[in-house]
């Protein structure tokens, strides 16, 4: 009992203390480079800022589209409007302390349309895995453009960077095969002392969903590049694929940190570090871009989520109340649709900032 209490206290200290440390390090860096920052003349192009904002909003909409596609491949067919409203409105409760309510809300809400909990849970598991994999695939592809710029390009010659990118893509495609993926997933669950899960989907389905996520990352990465152009009109066109890869990998790094909400601090640090390796920017610009991208993407998310929440707010509140007495984690529930095998649900689900069921 005491060990569990210490564990919770330690986790809370990390969740609060680590962002404070990151913020302190950032402020110290700004202080040390303040003269160089003020010497640089930043150009704010409002039209490009607006275009970048629109791109981040498109990415938010793509989430619901991809989730609808995943549900359809699991045998649960819902209308696009319903999927968008459920996905985006359930994200609203992600800002409630605990950082798990959006998972529970989506599972319970979609159940009102006849989708069983195992299928809902499986769809979210596939969504998470393919989204992370797509981010790494996009970054691996962007490595093919790193040889012309930055520290990596000066340390490694062109063929080595190309080989690294190609090998990473091949390895990810192998890992996404259902046999390999299920084996690795259950290995991790056993190490965490959780129940196993069987994802009964075809390899072609996983690849198509991953491809859809790659398209989503392309949209977000283009918005990120336009954001860079808004402040630095001299950004070369070859920086476009580099920006797409950096933004995708930075999101992955922020997600798997599991400490701060939405990878706060980790994503920004990753963007600054990757820019230092891949693309020489004016002093301080990488930090400004990292913070500005967080701000613009968050505003885009809040607007999309608020619209969806207002269109189904009563349902969200009633489901949130019901989720306090209905937790995912019931084993051996049958998953209907397209011959899917029984799905065992693990006790916890990885989410940004923690896990469900801890």
Model-derived regions: residue spans:
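Transmembrane alpha-helix interface/packing and boundary motifs in multi-pass membrane proteins
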Residues: 89-96, 248-268
